[in-house]
Amino acid sequence: MEMYFKRMKDEWTGLVEQADPLIRAKAAEIALAHAHYLSIEFYRIVRIDPHAEEFLSNEQVERQLKSAMERWIINVLSAQVDDVERLIQIQHTVAEVHARIGIPVEIVEMGFRVLKKILYPVIFSSDYSAAEKLQVYHFSINSIDIAMEVMTRAFTFSDSSASKEDENYRIFSLLENGEEEKERQIASILSWEIDIIYKVLLDSDLGSSLPLSQADFGLWFNHKGRHYFSGIAEVGHISRLIQDFDGIFNQTMRNTRILNNRSLRVKFLLQIRNTVSQIITLLRELFEEVSRHEVGMDVLTKLLNRRFLPTIFKREIAHANRTGTPLSVLIIDVDKFKEINDTWGHNTGDEILRKVSFLSQKRLVKSKILGAGSSRKLAVS
C-alpha cells in the first residue's frame, strides 16, 4: 500500500502543479461558495437509495456528515502541493471508517458519481468564460477521481482487514474454550479406538462399530471442525486419514474373516493406532494454530479486548437495524483507579479489575457481550 500511496501522491501533485494557478483559484472559489449547497444536495440524492439510507437515517450523524462533506469538497478542490500528502491520509482515514461501520463500496462509488453530477451545473452557472469553466471542471473532476481512487483502494484494503478480523473473532468465539474442546475431541477419538480394539480382541468382530466418519469425533470434525479451521492445511490431512481408514474399515466389515487371521488382525489394529495417532497429532497442531487468536483476550480480566470491539459493534448495529430493536452501550469506568494503584500498589489495582470484570460478567444475561475497553474501562453491548 505504501508504494501505491506514493504513486498517487506523485500523480495528485502533478495534477496540481500542471494546472493553471488561476484555474486552481477558481476551483477553490467554487468550493468555498457552494460546498454547503453541494453537501445538502449530495445527501438528499444519496438518501433516495434505500440501502444508503440505512447508514444515513440518523439525524445527528447526517448533520456531522454534511459538515464533513463540506470540508472534504473544500479541501479537495482547493488542494495545494503541500496539501497532497495530508489529503491522501484523509482519504485513507475516511475509508477505514467506512469499512469499520460496514458501508459497502458501491454506496461510496455512487456518492462520488452524484457529487460529480451536481458539481457540473454549479461550475457552468458561474460567470467564468467558457474556456475557464471547462478547465475548472476538468481540474475538479480529476481531483475528485484521484481522491475517489485512493479512498476506494484504501477501503478495499481496510475492508479486507476488517473481514479477516471478523473471521478471527468468529474463530475466537467458537474456540474460546479451545483447550477444553481439544481434550474433548481427543478423548472422543480415543474412546472410539478403544471400543473397536476391545471388540476385535475379544470377539474378532467389529459388531455394531461405526466407521470413523460416523463416530462422534468424525461427526464433530465434518460438521464443525472443518468449518472452524477452514483454510488450515491440517484439515485436509485429517480428512484424508478419515477417508482412507473408512475404506479399510468398510472392507473389514464386509469380510469379517480377515479378523480371524492373526497377522491380518494385528495389521488392522496397527492401522487403527497409526491413524488415530496421526489425527491426534494434527488435531493438536490445529488448536495450536488458532491459539494465537487468544490475543483477542485481555490477559488480566479474561475479557475480549479492544481488538474485537469494532467487529462486535458492527455486528450488533446490523442486528439492531435488521430487527428494529434498540441498542445500548454501557461504559463502566472503574473510579479512583490511579489512586488505588498509587496507594495500595498495582497488584491490588489488578485484583480490583479482575473482581469488577468477574462480577459484571456474572450478572450479565447470556446474550450480552462484555469487553475490556481500556486499562480501566469495560464496555457492555
Swiss-Prot record:
Q: Where is this site: Critical for restricting water access to the heme distal side to avoid rapid autoxidation?
A: 65
Q: Which PROSITE patterns match?
A: GGDEF
Note how many cofactor molecules are bound and how. Binds 1 heme group per subunit. Binds 1 Mg(2+) ion per subunit.
Citing just one GO molecular function, the answer is: metal ion binding
Q: Enzyme group, top EC level?
A: transferase
**Example of a GO biological process term:** cell adhesion involved in single-species biofilm formation
Q: Write out the residues that bind Mg(2+).
A: 333
From the Swiss-Prot or TrEMBL record, give the protein name.
Answer: Diguanylate cyclase DosC
Task: Specify the species.
Answer: Shigella flexneri serotype 5b (strain 8401)
The organism's taxonomy opens as:
Bacteria, Pseudomonadati, Pseudomonadota, Gammaproteobacteria, Enterobacterales
